[in-house]
Amino acid sequence: MKDLLYLKDDQIKEFIQLLYYAYRETFSDSKEVLSKKFFGPAHLRALNLIERNPGINLGELIYDLKVTKQSLNRVLRDLIKSKMIKQIKDENDTRKKNLFLDREGKTFFEIVYNTQKKRIFNALKNSSSDSVIKFKDVLKKIINGK
């Protein structure tokens, strides 16, 4: 059987380290923009999920972020107070509140996104389409635990 060198412990540890550095660098690009609003990484994660999933409800957001309701409430209060997001009662179940980016939030998110986009865009542009597709496939398998 062929020896799979990329499955050895040292290779896996290196891959984990590279994932960390990629995450760190991608999100450090937006740190200055976030700090002007006194926001941190938790605010950005919430904004990102709300932007990508307009109308997401609180339970779904908690599940996707893997945080407690208590920790998310502080972040949401900050975002609502800053007019970044708005809560709208669900038409079918008024106990649920759906979250949307407000106009200010859309503008702010675009600024943050554009700071991160440069790094990702350059990496994708300087890779073959086959590499990008395979990398995306590997990331999805990491996320899904397969």
Would you name each region that the model predicts?
Residues 1-37, 84:
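N-terminal leader segment of winged-helix/HTH proteins
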Residues 1-7, 129-146:
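C-terminal regulatory/oligomerization modules of transcriptional regulators
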Residues 11, 39, 50, 101, ...:
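Residue-level marker of regulatory loop/turn positions in helix-turn-helix DNA-binding domains and
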Residues 27, 77-136:
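Charged, amphipathic alpha-helical coiled-coil/dimerization segments
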Residues 28-68:
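N-terminal helix-turn-helix DNA-binding core of bacterial DNA-binding proteins
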Residues 50-53, 114, 142:
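Short helix-capping/turn signature of helix-turn-helix
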